[in-house]
């Protein structure tokens, strides 16, 4: 009711008591009912509308709608893209290896990140406030923390796997199986769960943030408990994993540089092919690095905001500065499938093979499709580097060129089992393959074999001749041939045994 509007033309002279009394009489219950209009101001009567315990932010409506539209696009892309990654890597036999279990796990974490975060965020943005209650807020924030931490730890495991495959390939032969990869992933999930549960037990809390349309852990409250949780969270799930990733790629850079130098020193026609395979390995390692960098870049703005509030400068942060970095962080779930679709040849070929309707969208050529899958069907009995370089190499040089245990890097993981390589099945998944293998010894037909009689010649003459004559002897190598046409062991992971 507006008193001024109902008595807009009534004026009383100063000191006129009769006029004042008449004005008060007009405000009686009868006139109040006749002049009553809906009042939209604050009121103490809430029996017609349920209370809203969560606060709201005074921002334009279009800000909520824009953020809601962006998060909806991110969610749809993340769900569809990561579902395709999971389907293709589980369907394709050449991609179904122990190392690729890390990639599938990353896609699973990103899939559930998009599935649990985007629809709720979008619905809350349409209502311009949090509408789902306290329990759903806690569950929503818990899922975001769990899947975000799991993605970071999985990327760390991928970097470590790449580093070991390139720097210590022989150490992985027979030591990496699906069971061991599954054990690593179990540790990753338990570690992520351990850092996501404390807010349920009073160490920090899960509360609305930013524009009050999403929830996260409480990093705005300046208390010792909240600050301790935030600081330890960033140390153990962001900075330490990031340091491990950087160390792994520094080791990869150094190993590839050393391998290139050693291969160039070998004057043989096959070294160029080995060098090309090494370049392919480096290319796939760079793709992995790109995925990791995009993930770190996506979470960096959110990290800066949280650490700023933890340092005691939360008054400098606006609702936009809290919500926009949260959207960017959740968008990290879409980088993985997009990068695969653009750069990973075997993934592109598998998509075109199992989902033909996407072949035109990804522009997969027939040549690319044939070349990608032909590598999985060829025999693994390829000539080794030692047998190709046998001519003109002395006994001592043959042992050195064949990469005896002191030269592990020459048998690099150019065809290792991770998704980042050109040839997907290798020695690191030896224990996961079937036992129907044929062990063969390959001996070059161009070698000169000393007869038994010649070995009984004068010892001094033979020693003198061996010291000056360049003799090529066969250096047997053990290669494994699988029963499956799609799973083969590359020569880069064969066990090279130098002959005496």
UniProtKB/Swiss-Prot annotation:
Pfam family of the protein (one): 7tm_1
Record's bilayer topology term: Multi-pass membrane protein
Keyword entries, A-Z: Cell membrane, Chromophore, Disulfide bond, G-protein coupled receptor, Glycoprotein, Membrane, Photoreceptor protein, Receptor, Retinal protein, Sensory transduction, Transducer, Transmembrane, Transmembrane helix
Keyword rRNA-binding: no
GO molecular function: G protein-coupled receptor activity; photoreceptor activity
Chain positions found as N6-(retinylidene)lysine: 330
Composition bias type Polar residues, residue spans: 411-428, 448-462
Principal subcellular localization: membrane
Tissue expression from the record: Expressed in a subset of retinal horizontal cells as well as in retinal ganglion cells.
Record's GO cellular component terms: plasma membrane
Glycosylated residue positions: 18
Top-rank lineage group of the source organism: Eukaryota
Topological domain spans for side Extracellular: 1-65, 123-138, 204-232, 308-322
Membrane-crossing segments per the record: 66-86, 102-122, 139-159, 183-203, 233-253, 287-307, 323-343
Cystine crosslinks: 137-215
PANTHER family, per the entry: OPSIN (PTHR24240)
Chain's role: Photoreceptor implicated in non-image-forming responses to light.
Name of this chain's protein: Melanopsin
UniProt lineage: Eukaryota, Metazoa, Chordata, Craniata, Vertebrata
Gene name as annotated: opn4
């Amino acid at each position: 009711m507006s008193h001024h509007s109902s008595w807009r033309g009534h004026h009383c002279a100063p000191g006129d008591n009769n006029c004042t009394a008449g004005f008060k009489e007009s405000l009686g219950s009868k006139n109040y009912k006749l002049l009553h209009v809906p009042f939209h101001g604050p009121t103490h009567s809430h029996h017609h509308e349920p209370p809203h315990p969560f606060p709201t932010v005074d921002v334009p409506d279009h800000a909520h709608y824009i953020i809601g539209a962006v998060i909806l696009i991110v969610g749809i892309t993340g769900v569809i893209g990561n579902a395709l990654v999971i389907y293709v890597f589980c369907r394709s036999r050449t991609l179904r290896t122990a190392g690729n279990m890390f990639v599938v796990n990353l896609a699973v974490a990103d899939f559930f990140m998009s599935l649990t975060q985007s629809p709720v965020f979008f619905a809350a943005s349409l209502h311009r406030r949090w509408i789902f209650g306290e329990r759903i807020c806690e569950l929503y924030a818990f899922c975001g923390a769990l899947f975000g931490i799991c993605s970071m730890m999985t990327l760390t495991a991928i970097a470590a796997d790449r580093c070991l495959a390139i720097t210590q390939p022989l150490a992985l032969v027979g030591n990496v199986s699906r069971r061991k990869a599954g054990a690593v992933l179990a540790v990753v999930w338990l570690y992520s769960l351990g850092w996501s549960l404390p807010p349920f037990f009073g160490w920090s809390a899960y509360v609305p943030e930013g524009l009050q349309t999403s929830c996260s852990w409480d990093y705005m409250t300046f208390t010792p408990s909240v600050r301790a949780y935030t600081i330890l969270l960033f140390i153990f799930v962001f900075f330490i994993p990031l340091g491990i990733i950087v160390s792994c790629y520094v080791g990869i850079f150094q190993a590839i540089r050393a391998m290139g130098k050693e291969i160039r020193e070998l004057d043989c026609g096959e070294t160029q092919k080995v060098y090309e395979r090494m370049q392919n390995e480096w290319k796939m390692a760079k793709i992995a690095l790109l995925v990791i960098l995009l993930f770190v870049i996506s979470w960096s703005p959110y990290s800066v905001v949280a650490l700023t509030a933890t340092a005691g400068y939360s008054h400098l942060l606006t609702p936009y500065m809290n919500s926009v970095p949260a959207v960017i962080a959740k968008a990290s779930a879409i980088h993985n499938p997009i990068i695969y679709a653009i750069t990973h040849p075997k993934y592109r070929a598998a998509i075109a093979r199992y989902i033909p309707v996407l072949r035109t969208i990804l522009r997969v050529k027939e040549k690319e499709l044939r070349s990608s899958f032909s590598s999985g069907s060829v025999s693994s009995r390829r000539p080794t580097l030692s047998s190709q370089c046998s001519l003109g190499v002395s006994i001592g040089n043959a042992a050195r060129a064949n990469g005896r245990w002191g030269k592990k890097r020459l048998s690099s993981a150019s065809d290792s089992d991770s998704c980042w390589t050109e040839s997907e099945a290798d020695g690191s998944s030896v224990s996961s393959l079937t036992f129907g293998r044929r062990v063969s010894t390959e001996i070059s037909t161009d070698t000169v074999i000393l007869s038994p009689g010649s070995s009984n010649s004068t010892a001094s003459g033979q020693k003198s001749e061996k010291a000056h004559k360049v003799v090529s002897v066969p250096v047997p190598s053990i290669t494994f041939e699988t029963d499956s046409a799609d799973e083969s062991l590359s020569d880069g992971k064969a066990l090279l045994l130098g002959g005496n």
